[in-house]
């Protein structure tokens, strides 16, 4: 059951607002997984510059379970952030962030891909256990839809949005590896939305191979 675990590092995928609907994978399961792993560091999907912000601010921009983890564990374990929301916001509050306003669901091919993704979320992630949610075959299905979506988006002139998503994931990976490197020998649990799990785990594996570990 040591899914997505390598030596002292564990990557745990979460399902954001679906935790409120999925009785098999609630915040209690996240809490238990953290306690069971006994980490020295908890890395969550919040920008590190926002870690010290109040909940009233965070709740508008970040997944609820990330805020709950921060609130519950920051007084007993080191909690750090590894998210990224764009170069323009490097030292800016996140309220200046302007996500894409384009309504892309009006295009049938995009709409069909979004429906396929939503069906997986509804059929699987609303009922799966914490262990089933980390299942690689299901994550690969979502990844495949994302790749197809990017091809279609490119056809609608959305190259900037695709680049932003790629940059975000790459920098999240860089930030994660820096946290691990800066805390060499310590136990680190990385908590992220399920759609980032495969990428981050691959980055972790590659970094270990390069270090001949």
Feature names for model-found ranges:
Residues 15, 194-195:
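Active-site metal-binding loops of divalent metal-dependent hydrolases
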Residues 41, 50-185, 194, 202-203:
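Hydrophobic, often amphipathic alpha-helical segments used for membrane interaction and targeting
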Residues 12-15, 45-47, 82-85:
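Active-site-proximal beta-strand/loop segments in catalytic clefts of secreted hydrolases
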Residues 2-35, 49-51:
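Zymogen propeptides
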Residues 10, 80-82, 212:
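General small-molecule cofactor/ligand-binding pocket signal
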Residues 9-10, 186-192:
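Generic beta-sheet signal
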